[in-house]
């Protein structure tokens, strides 16, 4: 083995060892989410929210593959007849945040839903979608008042990141738009949460 290829092997091995030490998903019951491609994480979110609606007896039709348009369409489906865009993110190991790519025209659907998956729980956030003006304004997000929506170069796609602590904080406000799932959360709690927000 040449000195150069040996150096590359050693560098890859060192990075792999760091990665193994940082594996926050190692003991998670849904640890396979960490190995999925980003678009498949999105499909997990869509199918999971559809499943929650079915378990709750809430009318829903969700299949983002049939509603997509370049730059963003009218959402991934409908819940209670209302259009909903669903964004699913997993907690990053090196960057402890949930990163949501919102597309170029995220204001088209009536509602936005974030499913933020952590190793030991998940957060479901649903809110009436923002207007085009709100997305472009650089003002704080009304449902996450310490954050702003990122609009890349004022012409591309929009992005919004949350964190575990931010979700916990927002779940504690009165009439919260964020729900924390734990082992004790019942399907009735989820049903009441969805029905309270999507009207």
PLM feature spans:
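Nucleic-acid endonuclease domains
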Residues: 1-82, 87-199
């Amino acid at each position: 083995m040449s000195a150069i290829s040996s150096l590359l092997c050693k560098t890859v091995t060192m990075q792999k060892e760091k990665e193994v030490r940082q594996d926050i998903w190692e003991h998670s019951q849904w640890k396979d989410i960490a190995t999925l491609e980003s678009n498949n994480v999105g499909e997990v979110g869509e199918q999971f929210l559809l499943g929650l609606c079915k378990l709750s007896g809430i009318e829903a039709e969700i299949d983002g593959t049939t509603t997509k348009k370049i730059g963003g369409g009218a959402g991934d489906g409908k819940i209670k007849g209302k259009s909903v865009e669903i964004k699913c993110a997993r907690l990053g190991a090196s960057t402890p945040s949930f990163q949501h790519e919102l597309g170029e025209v995220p204001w088209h659907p009536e509602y936005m839903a974030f499913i933020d998956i952590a190793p030991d729980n998940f957060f479901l956030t649903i809110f009436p979608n923002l207007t085009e003006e709100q997305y472009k304004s650089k003002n704080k997000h009304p449902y996450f008042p310490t954050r702003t929506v990122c609009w890349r170069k004022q012409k591309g796609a929009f992005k919004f990141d949350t964190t575990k602590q931010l979700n916990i904080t927002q779940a504690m406000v009165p009439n919260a738009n964020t729900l924390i799932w734990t082992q004790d959360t019942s399907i009735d709690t989820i049903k009441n949460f969805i029905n309270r927000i999507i009207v």
